A protein has these predicted regions:
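C-terminal "cap" of GNAT-fold acetyltransferases
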Residues: 143, 147-152, 160, 166-187
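Hydrophobic pocket/interface hotspot
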Residues: 26, 58
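Conserved N-terminal entry element of GNAT/NAT acetyltransferase domains
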Residues: 1-24
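Conserved acyl-donor/pantetheine-binding loop and adjacent beta-alpha core of acyl/acetyltransferases
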Residues: 64, 71, 77-121, 131, ...
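Glycine-rich phosphate-binding loop
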Residues: 124
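Conserved GNAT-fold acetyl-CoA-binding loop/helix
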Residues: 31-57
Length: 187
């Protein structure tokens, strides 16, 4: 596990909101990111079982205008976002019902679906997206944030001051499970 270093004052890549037209590129990036960056923490079988139901594109984040993309020369090299809805994780099709809106006065916002191209890992992309998400969360009136972090993502969120609430396993198909860490922060 590498240590997290401070991000440069200005990131060399622009961040923008994701659009429906980005879905195909995101669908290519996510498995690439997960297979490379999660492999020190999860077995290949766990990774393959999690692609889609746990690790996948959630178009609701795009429709809500809460999902950000980092680009370099027009290529998506990272993505991540936040949600004002109940779900803590999962891609399209992982929920059987409408994902209800949260109340900023009572509920915690969710940080969701961070993925970075393996060739661009550990260069500050996740930190840049996280800082943008936290500002948007504050601007939307939320004062607390929940995350269900992968074991690989836990150091990034700890760097930002998120505290471990609990460790648990997400049940998946074929009697597989994925260990994760629920984390929380007051912003």
């Amino acid at each position: 596990m590498s240590s997290i270093s401070p991000m440069p004052r200005t990131a060399p890549w622009p961040l923008r909101l994701a659009h429906e037209a980005d879905v195909s590129a995101l669908e290519a990036l996510i498995p690439l990111s997960v297979r490379a960056l999660q492999s020190p923490y999860y077995s290949q079988a766990q990774i393959e079982a999690a692609l889609g139901p746990v690790f996948g594109v959630d178009r609701q984040l795009i429709r809500d205008g809460t999902y950000f993309i980092a680009e370099q020369d027009g290529v998506i090299i990272g993505c991540g976002g936040w949600s004002k809805r109940r779900a803590l994780y999962g891609g399209d099709g992982s929920r059987e019902h409408e994902d209800e809106l949260l109340d900023p006065q009572r509920d915690a916002a969710r940080v969701r679906a961070f993925f970075v191209h393996p060739d661009w890992a550990r260069r500050g992309i996740g930190r840049s997206i996280m800082a943008t998400c936290e500002q948007a969360i504050r601007d939307s009136g939320f004062r607390t944030v929940d995350i269900v972090a992968t074991l690989a993502g836990e150091p990034l969120y700890a760097f930002f001051g998120y505290a471990v609430v609990e460790r648990y396993d997400i049940a998946m198909a074929s009697d597989m499970s994925l260990p994760v860490v629920k984390m929380n922060k007051r912003i």
